[in-house]
Amino acid sequence: MELTRAKHIAFFKRHLILFPTPYEEHDCERTVLAFFCLLGLDLLNALNTIDDDDKKSWIEWIYKNYVTKESKGIKYSGFQAYRTGIQPISFEQEPQLAGTVFSICCLLFLGDNLSRIDRDLIKNFVELCKTSQGHFRSIAVPSCSDQDMRQLYMATTIASLLDFSLSDPLCSIQYIKSCQRYEGGFSLLPYGEAHAGATFCALASWSLILKMIPNSSLNTSNQSYNLMDCVPKVERLIRWLASRQLSSGGLNGRTNKDVDTCYAYWVLSSLKLLDALPFIDGGELEKYLLLHAQHALGGFSKTPGEFPDVLHSALGLYAMAYQDDKSFPKVNADIHMTSKYINICRDCIQAAKGK
């Protein structure tokens, strides 16, 4: 069974024009859905098949979700995942970490140079989302209860893309450590269940934080720039990640759970960050994805027999890219983009700094 590349390209392009009924409950997350469509096309080397007028129109739509606010004399800005309705953004509608990181990625995919965003105000927004325990809320409102490892990952990704450092990064590392479970994997919150998605967010955040802080801050017996040397119980962690692969070749995200296409991405990315990718049988995983997750109409499904969706389709392709650098562009492990667009982002930020 081969990758039906043309069908996958058509699948993502269809969804960029119109999302089917099953996506209705995710209407407030349109930017996130658009990101997975654009990521999928980038992995298939097909972003150039999007019409230039469409790209310009979508860029303008994304910037309509950019909002600047003020709290206690501090101005901050960021993106919403989707501004609902036709009225201007109200004061009650806050920018979100998810909306901000996925909007930045979409703008890069569409060829924007990020010149209309204010890095300093976005940095203020990220810092206002931070808690005293080192993790982050999804919005800059102290009463927000949406705060876990995912928000920490989005905050560190925003900081990395826009080239600024987080305050007190070592506190965030301590929070990550507090979420490691006895199996070696990480949970979304302290004392939770080890989960492959949370484990990726923990390791990727840790990796990005290590790149932000000076070497002098790491001169302790237990810390270094090598993630493998930093993570406690690393052998147990690798064993737990490797055990996510089942006899079908697919991967699950938690102990005693069924396979799910997206965990191919979360697990392989985690192992890649630990230089331990060979612990997964890539051939069996690819066979599973192509035979059981790939859909006849294009795209990949969450589990065999279900309809495909853009998230599982993009992440399934990303997992395959780790195993095949000839058919796919080079991918990045700690930020969910191809290396090409990570470099483009750095060039955009350096150009903005030079003005």
Swiss-Prot record:
<feature type="binding site">
    <location>
        <position position="262"/>
    </location>
    <ligand>
        <name>Zn(2+)</name>
    </ligand>
</feature>
<dbReference type="GO" id="GO:0005953">
    <property type="term" value="C:CAAX-protein geranylgeranyltransferase complex"/>
</dbReference>
<feature type="binding site">
    <location>
        <position position="260"/>
    </location>
    <ligand>
        <name>Zn(2+)</name>
    </ligand>
</feature>
<feature type="binding site">
    <location>
        <begin position="263"/>
        <end position="266"/>
    </location>
    <ligand>
        <name>geranylgeranyl diphosphate</name>
    </ligand>
</feature>
<comment type="function">
    <text>Catalyzes the transfer of a geranyl-geranyl moiety from geranyl-geranyl pyrophosphate to proteins having the C-terminal C-A-A-L where A is an aliphatic amino acid. In particular it modifies the GTP-binding component of the 1,3-beta-D-glucan synthase.</text>
</comment>
<protein>
    <recommendedName>
        <fullName>Geranylgeranyl transferase type-1 subunit beta</fullName>
        <ecNumber>2.5.1.59</ecNumber>
    </recommendedName>
</protein>
<dbReference type="InterPro" id="IPR041960">
    <property type="entry name" value="GGTase_I_beta"/>
</dbReference>
<feature type="repeat" description="PFTB 3">
    <location>
        <begin position="234"/>
        <end position="275"/>
    </location>
</feature>
<dbReference type="Pfam" id="PF00432">
    <property type="entry name" value="Prenyltrans"/>
</dbReference>
<dbReference type="GO" id="GO:0061951">
    <property type="term" value="P:establishment of protein localization to plasma membrane"/>
</dbReference>
<keyword id="KW-0479">Metal-binding</keyword>
<feature type="binding site">
    <location>
        <position position="312"/>
    </location>
    <ligand>
        <name>Zn(2+)</name>
    </ligand>
</feature>
<dbReference type="GO" id="GO:0005634">
    <property type="term" value="C:nucleus"/>
</dbReference>
<feature type="repeat" description="PFTB 2">
    <location>
        <begin position="169"/>
        <end position="210"/>
    </location>
</feature>
<comment type="similarity">
    <text>Belongs to the protein prenyltransferase subunit beta family.</text>
</comment>
<keyword id="KW-0862">Zinc</keyword>
<dbReference type="InterPro" id="IPR008930">
    <property type="entry name" value="Terpenoid_cyclase/PrenylTrfase"/>
</dbReference>
<dbReference type="GO" id="GO:0004662">
    <property type="term" value="F:CAAX-protein geranylgeranyltransferase activity"/>
</dbReference>
<keyword id="KW-0677">Repeat</keyword>
<feature type="binding site">
    <location>
        <begin position="254"/>
        <end position="257"/>
    </location>
    <ligand>
        <name>geranylgeranyl diphosphate</name>
    </ligand>
</feature>
<feature type="binding site">
    <location>
        <begin position="195"/>
        <end position="197"/>
    </location>
    <ligand>
        <name>geranylgeranyl diphosphate</name>
    </ligand>
</feature>
<keyword id="KW-0637">Prenyltransferase</keyword>
<comment type="subunit">
    <text>Heterodimer of an alpha(cwp1) and a beta(cwg2) subunit.</text>
</comment>
<dbReference type="InterPro" id="IPR001330">
    <property type="entry name" value="Prenyltrans"/>
</dbReference>
<feature type="repeat" description="PFTB 1">
    <location>
        <begin position="119"/>
        <end position="163"/>
    </location>
</feature>
<dbReference type="InterPro" id="IPR045089">
    <property type="entry name" value="PGGT1B-like"/>
</dbReference>
<feature type="repeat" description="PFTB 4">
    <location>
        <begin position="282"/>
        <end position="324"/>
    </location>
</feature>
<keyword id="KW-0808">Transferase</keyword>
<dbReference type="GO" id="GO:0018344">
    <property type="term" value="P:protein geranylgeranylation"/>
</dbReference>
<dbReference type="GO" id="GO:0008270">
    <property type="term" value="F:zinc ion binding"/>
</dbReference>
<dbReference type="GO" id="GO:0005829">
    <property type="term" value="C:cytosol"/>
</dbReference>
<keyword id="KW-0460">Magnesium</keyword>
